[in-house]
A protein has these predicted regions:
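Non-catalytic, conserved peripheral segments adjacent to functional cores
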Residues: 1-55, 72, 77, 81-134
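Short beta-strand His + acidic residue motifs that chelate non-heme Fe in jelly-roll/DSBH
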Residues: 57, 65-70
């Protein structure tokens, strides 16, 4: 659960896929493809998911993902494997190269997400390449 104005992300995984669904509230989703050499490398997509449109979002490995709570939000998410803290990676939510449209003004951002590096500064061993090997 997140209160209106909260911003989570951008996170990404080299091995894990996520699936998000919002039964209550409105979340503004921002996805950015970090997979170097892939057909959609560098593309950013922004859209809302909510209890009204009933959209679910599949997020493959190598795609940075985050959301802002447009309203108070309840989000359910599934992952395709066991939790691995070494696969919890991040990139700056406000990176101008990514250019996400977060909708909220004056977002509430966790300390962890405030310190994520810019895309250009991602360490070599933490950069996803196409094709992904899980």
């Amino acid at each position: 659960n997140k209160q209106a104005g909260a911003l989570v992300g951008l996170h990404y995984h080299l091995h894990q896929a996520d699936y998000w669904y919002v039964p209550i509230g409105i979340a503004r989703v921002v996805l950015h493809d970090l997979r170097v050499g892939g057909p959609t490398d560098g593309n950013t997509a922004c859209f809302n998911i909510s209890g009204e449109n009933h959209w679910g979002v599949y997020i493959p490995p190598g795609v940075a993902h985050g959301f802002s709570a447009v309203t108070d939000v309840v989000m359910t998410y599934l992952v395709d494997g066991y939790y691995n803290p070494a696969d919890e990676l991040g990139v700056a939510w406000n990176d101008t190269e990514i250019g996400g449209d977060w909708v909220v003004t004056d977002p509430i951002v966790s300390e962890r997400d405030q310190t994520n590096p810019l895309r250009v500064d991602l360490p070599e061993g933490r950069r996803p390449y196409w094709p992904m090997r899980t």
